[in-house]
Amino acid sequence: MNRRDFLRRMTLVGIGAALFPFFPDAAEASWYIPSALPGVTIKPTYLSFGALENRFVTDCIVIHHIGNTNADVSAATVHEWHLHNGWAGIGYHFLVRKDGTIEEGRPMGTVGAHVYGENRHTVGINIVGNFEDAVPTEAQKHSAAHLIAALCTVYQLDPIWGVTVKGHRDFNATACPGRYLYAELPEIVEEARVYYGSDELQTERLRIMQQERAEQEQQRARMRTRMEAAQNKNGRPS
């Protein structure tokens, strides 16, 4: 079942009727920042950044590798490297470690620093390693596929290799993300397509949206309570 059929079925059974107004439309999805990504676990890193800009268009996911080492470096380590370059912090939005752990990099809704001339409309994923000489682990490929599917779900992109998912070398004159990873990206994106159309991912997406709606309603209720309290206080005789 693909994503469109799944959402249509949810609407028919009544779930979508309650939640669908909280799904962003195609234009809104380009800048929408969810409370969580569906179907993947992101390890927080609590990094401190310099000044960042919001990204208002998202139409492509760009894949990178570390390149200068095949070591299992962390987002915190890359953050220090990029700070040393005079940047605001790590330029990638996500890192995929050797064991498949996905680490948080630059905040997802901000402009990255990972692909020259194309940062304002792209999300950057770094799969850790030097893939000119080595190959990615199975855990990395699996996590990258699920992360791509989750991002495509949020930004309403169809995961298509060479269109909405590309390698760094497709934009700039570079070997990144390495010949061995680049050769495997079509297969990784195909796995992402399968997961993208799964009931599992879309059910999780609905759960997150429902949670966001409940939190928004709670915030509105708290705001109404504060406003009423202020009005009552101001309306009392001195």
What are the functions of these language-model segments?
Residues L95, G124-N126:
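Conserved beta-strand segments that form the floor/walls of ligand-binding pockets within enzyme
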Residues N2, R8-T11, L19-F22, A26-T58, ...:
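Basic/polar, cationic surfaces and motifs that engage anionic cell-wall
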